[in-house]
Regions:
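Structured alpha-helical
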Residues: 1-102
């Protein structure tokens, strides 16, 4: 029996870049859902399965007067279709917007 991670339907802005090429642009998208094993997001780009990505999700404030945080993950595209990609996370990191680890 396989374990499936619970998915949270969260729509947030995404910025991503390919880590298997040098000097590529940072691209934009929007999350569809997030789980403990990865993220599914919409994008205008065609992303092939196997591509390595760094994905930064702009999270909302967790509490009044709290700083906003970003969720950054390193992973690989495991499924993709017309206008979407599923990225399996290899590593997660929570950052303050300035890029400093929380």
């Amino acid at each position: 029996m396989t374990h499936r991670s619970f998915r949270f339907s969260i729509e947030r802005p995404v910025e991503y870049r390919f880590t298997d090429t040098r000097g590529g642009p940072r691209l934009q998208g929007r999350t569809v859902n997030i789980s403990s094993t990865g993220v599914l997001f919409r994008t205008d780009e065609k992303i092939g399965v196997g591509r390595k990505l760094e994905v930064t999700v702009r999270m909302a404030q967790l509490a009044p007067n709290a700083p906003e945080i970003d969720l950054r993950l390193l992973g690989m595209a495991v499924r993709s279709g017309d206008g979407w990609v599923a990225v399996q996370a290899r590593k997660y990191q929570i950052l303050r917007p300035e890029g400093i680890a929380a």
